[in-house]
C-alpha cells in the first residue's frame, strides 16, 4: 500500500506522516510533470534544483520513494540508489502531451529505468481502447 504526500511539506511534516502511516509506504511528490515554470508559484529555484531539494528531503525522511518526472531519473539516482521512483507523464511515441510538460516516451523510459522505477501511464491508456493502447505503447519500445 502506498500513500502520496507532498515533499514540499518539509522534514517535520514528512517525519510525522511517516510515523502516522504505519505499514503504508509513503511516496513524496516532487515537482509535478505538468509544471515547467516554478517562478509562477513564487519558487526561484530551477526545476532541477527544486527536484534535488525535495528528493533529498524524501531520502532524509526515509520515505519509500518519490513521484517525479522520468526526466529526473538520473538526478534522483544520484541522491539515492534505494528510493522507488514512480514516473508520471510516460507516453507512447506519438501520444499527445495534454497538460504534461516534462514527459518521456515509454521506449526511452525502459532504456533509463532500473528495477525500482515504475511508469505511470494514464490518459494514453484510458483514452480509447485500453487494451489496444497498452499494446501500442509496449510495441513502441521495440
Labelled PLM ranges:
Residues 20, 127, 132-142:
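Catalytic-site microenvironment of enzymes
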Residues 1-74, 78-84, 90-97:
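Conserved anion-binding
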Residues 22-28, 118-120, 137-141:
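A generic structural signal for ordered secondary structure
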Residues 2-13, 90-95, 99-134:
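Glycine-rich phosphate-binding active-site loops on the catalytic face of alpha/beta enzymes
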Amino acid at each position: 500500500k502506498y500513500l502520496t504526500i507532498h515533499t514540499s511539506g518539509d522534514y517535520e511534516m514528512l517525519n510525522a506522516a511517516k510515523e502516522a502511516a504505519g505499514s503504508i509506504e509513503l511516496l513524496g511528490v516532487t515537482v509535478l510533470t505538468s509544471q515547467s515554470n516554478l517562478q509562477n508559484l513564487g519558487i526561484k529555484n530551477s526545476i532541477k534544483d527544486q527536484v534535488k531539494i525535495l528528493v533529498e528531503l524524501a531520502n532524509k525522511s526515509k520515505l519509500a520513494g518519490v513521484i517525479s518526472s522520468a526526466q529526473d531519473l538520473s538526478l534522483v539516482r544520484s541522491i539515492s540508489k534505494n528510493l522507488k521512483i514512480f514516473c508520471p507523464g510516460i507516453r507512447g511515441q506519438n501520444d499527445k502531451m495534454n497538460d504534461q510538460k516534462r514527459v518521456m516516451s515509454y521506449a526511452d523510459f525502459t532504456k533509463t529505468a532500473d528495477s525500482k522505477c515504475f511508469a505511470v501511464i494514464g490518459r494514453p491508456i484510458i483514452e480509447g481502447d485500453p487494451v489496444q493502447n497498452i499494446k501500442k505503447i509496449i510495441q513502441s519500445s521495440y
